[in-house]
């Protein structure tokens, strides 16, 4: 069988206008340099860029098949990380974790405006391939490691694990009603990267009795850790999130396991967008007046926040309730990102109240938006 060259195998990005980040950064020369390289687990550059080939409109189009992908293919990953995270060069380093909820300033909002709060992060177990390349045996072992650790949680964090394969119709119905159940993903990243192989083998959901602390196992990331509750107490959600995450890490270490961590990139996740903290702190925020302001989108961006619809990404806002979160994941600690959300949401509510009173907000907007 003939051996084809890298240039013969180079993806066709030109015909779609290089809409994804990979298409903008991966040249034929770079591809040729990376073409023959393999990680210790056998992951190739083609495995990592497959989402960009199958769906050229995707923003990033790049996944890591294992933690080592970030180093072996760093020429491409570093370029994409630098663009995605607004400047993060080869010598930059992500700060150490900071889960100190007591150091937060504010964070308790009027439930008239903040309907609920949610904080999540992604984690990967050190020593295993990531979802795009993980084997069935590895995935099952990851499930075992995490479930064993969760069994050690006590008090308000104690809960029950529901494997997708063994779920009863009643359990499934309840989890759907709670909006907890993740179905087989159909998104381009998961499907094109191969992360949905063998579904639903070794996938499951765990939650505590109060349904305020939730774990997803083997979805886009090996572990998704989520804290949430109704109302406006963001600080309480971060406290529970931090306490649960710290306890899980401690229980894992007792059995000789830990989460994958890079001194430069922070916690390792499947998608480069989630490197660093992997943290997304969000609130459901009702803004009847501000959402009608002509600079609403610009105001959100000015506070380094991101806006989604009520149901999350690619949904519309219902009754002017928006999902507002931190935009970045890298270059700041967990506490700093939650504080950024708190500060920004506080300003948005301040503007909403002024508009409710029939006043202008033009004079109190960030300097970059005045005029």
Swiss-Prot record:
SUPFAM superfamilies in the record: Glutamine synthetase/guanido kinase (SSF55931), Guanido kinase N-terminal domain (SSF48034)
Key words of the record: ATP-binding, Kinase, Nucleotide-binding, Transferase
Name listed for the protein in its UniProt record: Lombricine kinase
Phosphagen kinase N-terminal domain ranges (all copies): 1-86
Residue ranges of coiled coil: none
A GO molecular-function descriptor: creatine kinase activity
Domain Phosphagen kinase C-terminal: 113-355
InterPro entries per the UniProt record, alphabetical: ATP-guanido_PTrfase, ATP-guanido_PTrfase_AS, ATP-guanido_PTrfase_cat, ATP-guanido_PTrfase_N, ATP-guanido_PTrfase_N_sf, Gln_synth/guanido_kin_cat_dom
Keyword Transferase: yes
The protein's enzyme class: transferase
EC number: 2.7.3.5
GO cellular component annotations of the record: extracellular space
Subunit structure: Homodimer.
A Gene Ontology biological process term: phosphocreatine biosynthetic process
Reaction equation(s) it catalyzes: L-lombricine + ATP = N-phospho-L-lombricine + ADP + H(+)
Protein origin, superkingdom: Eukaryota
Pfam families recorded: ATP-gua_Ptrans, ATP-gua_PtransN
Positions with a binding annotation for ATP: 116-120, 179, 224, 280, 308-313, 323
Family of the protein in this entry: Belongs to the ATP:guanido phosphotransferase family.
């Amino acid at each position: 069988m003939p051996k084809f060259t890298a240039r013969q195998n180079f993806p066709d990005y030109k015909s779609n206008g290089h809409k994804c980040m990979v298409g903008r950064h991966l040249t034929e020369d770079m591809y040729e340099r990376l073409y023959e390289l393999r990680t210790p687990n056998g992951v190739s550059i083609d495995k990592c860029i497959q989402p960009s080939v199958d769906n050229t409109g995707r923003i990033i189009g790049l996944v890591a098949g294992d933690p080592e992908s970030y180093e072996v293919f760093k020429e491409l990953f570093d370029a994409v990380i630098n663009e995605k995270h607004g400047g993060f060069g080869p010598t930059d380093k992500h700060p150490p974790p900071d889960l100190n909820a007591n150091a937060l300033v504010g964070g308790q909002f009027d439930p008239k405006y903040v309907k609920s709060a949610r904080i999540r992060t992604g984690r990967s177990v050190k020593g295993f391939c990531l979802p795009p390349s993980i084997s069935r045996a590895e995935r099952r072992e990851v499930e075992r490691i995490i479930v064993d650790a969760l069994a050690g949680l006590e008090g308000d964090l104690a809960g029950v694990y529901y494997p997708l394969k063994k779920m009863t119709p009643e359990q499934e119905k309840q989890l759907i009603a709670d909006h907890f159940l993740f179905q087989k993903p159909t998104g381009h990243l998961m499907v094109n990267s191969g992360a949905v192989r063998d579904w639903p083998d070794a996938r499951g959901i765990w939650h505590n009795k109060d349904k305020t602390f939730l774990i997803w196992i083997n979805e886009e990331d090996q572990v998704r850790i989520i804290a949430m509750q109704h109302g406006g107490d963001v600080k309480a959600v971060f406290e529970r999130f931090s306490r649960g995450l710290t306890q899980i890490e401690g229980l894992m270490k007792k059995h000789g396991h830990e989460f994958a961590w890079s001194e430069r990139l922070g916690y390792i996740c499947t998608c480069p967008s989630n490197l660093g903290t992997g943290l997304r702190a969000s609130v459901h925020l009702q803004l009847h007046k501000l959402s009608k302001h002509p600079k609403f989108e610009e105001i959100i961006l000015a506070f380094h926040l991101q806006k989604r619809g009520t149901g999350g990404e690619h949904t519309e806002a219902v009754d002017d309730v928006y999902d507002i979160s931190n935009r970045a994941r890298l270059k700041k600690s967990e506490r700093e990102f939650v504080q950024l959300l708190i500060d920004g949401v506080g300003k948005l509510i301040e503007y909403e109240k002024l508009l409710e009173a029939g006043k202008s907000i033009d004079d109190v907007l960030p300097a970059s938006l005045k005029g």
